[in-house]
Regions:
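A short beta-loop-alpha structural element at the N-terminal edge
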Residues: 2-16, 20
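Active-site rim helix/loop that mediates acceptor-substrate recognition in acyltransferases
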Residues: 34-56
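Conserved beta-hairpin
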Residues: 49-69
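Conserved acyl-donor/pantetheine-binding loop and adjacent beta-alpha core of acyl/acetyltransferases
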Residues: 66-125, 131, 181-182
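Conserved GNAT acetyl-CoA-binding A-motif
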Residues: 117-119, 146-159
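Conserved acetyl-CoA-binding loop-helix of GNAT-fold acetyltransferases
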Residues: 126, 132-145, 169
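Conserved active-site alpha-helix within GNAT-family acetyltransferase domains
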Residues: 137, 149-151, 160-177, 183-184
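C-terminal "cap" of GNAT-fold acetyltransferases
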Residues: 152, 156-161, 180-205
């Protein structure tokens, strides 16, 4: 997998991939049901700007697939970005829509494990034009190799049950489930214990 760390110079590319990848997602298509494309793009750009504070936003060379990780001890948004996110929600979604989005985010926060340090897979998406080639899972597998080298655990939420078995094949196990408000979809949470790097092959004399 030919992957690299994304920078702010890649923001346009990674934001487009994430926006299109999650356009039909059971959770986020419901939460962002009302804004126009520019409004949705603004949400994702702000979220990615928060993640790009860390060197853990990964992309294939042309941005066909993107993974967004928050490292141990990190936050998805700075306090200033959180305030901007709330203002954007109210202006784009209205009071009711912003309240629903806030309730959705609270569900994710409440379910998030606290205790053992871990890498958090906030987002993983493939541009619709490049789906069906395993790029997202290949990028995730490459990332996990780096996380294993640190002996660290990993956590994710699966908003699409079609992906659960794919995550399990990469070592994630069921952690829990929660329902989103207003009869929303079920979100599965998954945990992958720290493993350590693969041992080097033994060379015999």
């Amino acid at each position: 997998m030919d992957a690299r760390v994304a920078t702010l110079a890649d923001l346009d590319v990674v934001a487009e991939t994430i926006q299109l990848a999650f356009a039909d997602d059971p959770v986020w298509s419901r939460a962002f049901a009302h804004p126009d494309d520019r409004g949705v793009a603004a949400f994702w750009r702000l979220w990615l700007e928060g993640a790009l504070r860390y060197p853990w936003v990964w992309m294939t060379q042309a941005g066909e697939a993107v993974s967004v990780w928050i490292p141990p001890g990190g936050d998805e948004l700075s306090p200033e970005q959180e305030a901007a996110f709330k203002r954007l929600a109210e202006s784009s979604l209205g009071r009711r829509g912003a309240s629903y989005l806030d309730a959705v985010m609270a569900c994710f926060t409440e379910a998030h494990p606290h205790g053992e340090p871990h890498y958090y897979l906030s987002l993983l998406g493939t541009h619709p034009a490049h789906r069906g080639h395993g790029l997202g899972m290949a990028l995730l597998a490459e990332n996990l190799t780096r996380i294993d080298a640190e002996g660290a655990a990993a956590y994710l939420e699966s908003s699409n049950s079609a992906n659960d078995q794919r995550y399990q094949r990469l070592g994630f196990a069921l952690h829990g489930r929660f329902n989103l408000p207003d009869d929303g979809p079920i979100v599965t949470t998954m945990w992958r214990p720290g493993r350590g790097p693969e041992p080097s092959p033994i060379r015999r004399p």
